[in-house]
Design a protein with these regions (language model features):
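Active-site-proximal helix/loop segments of hydrolytic enzymes
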Residues: 107-122, 126, 132-221
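N-terminal catalytic or cofactor-binding beta/alpha core of small enzyme domains
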Residues: 1-123, 135-139
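Conserved small/polar residues in nucleotide/adenosyl-binding loops
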Residues: 229-230
Length: 230
């Protein structure tokens, strides 16, 4: 993965970790047609957690991991669900453990969850796998000041078929991320880190606007995360 962004499209920076050349035709989202009313949120790594604080102390089930959903990335999913619902979106937030008790096979289990959810919500295009970024430096806390508050930065991770698995939707997924990030740049410059484009598909073949969103990293705290408005 490149250390810095390799592409800039209308102010949206992208780290291209694939062999694809990102042309304007690939990145242009003007023709993107998706159902914008319904949103699905789930967590492949449900137990991912943040740096504990006095106000947010929790029992770890592993390093920066907890099965207590009040202190894991699921809490961030709850906040995002509340925000999107207040804006009029229909949101399904699944809180199934996919990485506990076994971490290996998480993506296979979360794929089964999403496939089952799509049976009852077949028209959902926006499918968000909400994560906490895993960085070797556990003190790393990507953040930015918005107004008087310090908040955690966000990052889209978009998969492709570069790893050899079928993934006809990856360009649509990327266009969706570019569209959202361009708008976010106008409202909250710097809230998003560069989009990360990878060879793995991360179950994103299941939607026309499917993505991973990394919310902060291990060094961030829930105090910072609670201030995010998307």
């Amino acid at each position: 993965v490149p250390n810095k962004y390799t592409n800039d499209y209308q102010g949206v920076e992208i780290k291209n970790g694939t062999n694809y050349t990102l042309t304007d035709d690939i990145l242009n989202y003007e023709g993107l047609e998706i159902n914008q009313s319904d949103v699905m949120i789930f967590h492949t790594h449900t137990c991912e957690s943040y740096t504990p604080t006095e106000n947010f102390a929790y029992e770890e089930s592993g390093t920066f991991r907890t099965t207590d959903l009040d202190y894991s990335v699921v809490r961030v999913g709850n906040s995002l669900t509340d925000q999107l619902t207040s804006y009029g979106f229909n949101v399904v937030h699944d809180k199934t453990y996919h990485d506990y008790p076994a971490y290996s096979g998480s993506y296979g289990r979360s794929m089964a969850t999403v496939e089952n959810l799509l049976i009852s919500h077949p028209n959902t295009d926006i499918i968000i796998d909400l994560h906490r970024d895993a960085i070797a430096d556990t003190s790393y806390a990507p953040s930015i000041k918005i107004g008087d508050e310090v908040v955690s930065q966000l990052m889209f991770v978009i998969g492709t078929d570069g790893g050899g698995l079928e993934h006809p939707n990856w360009q649509k997924n990327l266009q969706f991320a570019v569209k959202v990030q361009k708008k976010a740049n106008e409202l909250y410059p710097g809230l998003f880190r560069p989009i990360l484009l990878r060879n793995s598909r991360y179950n994103q073949q299941l939607g026309k606007a499917a993505c991973i969103i990394e919310v902060g990293a291990t060094g961030n705290t829930l105090e910072q995360l609670s201030l995010i408005h998307i």
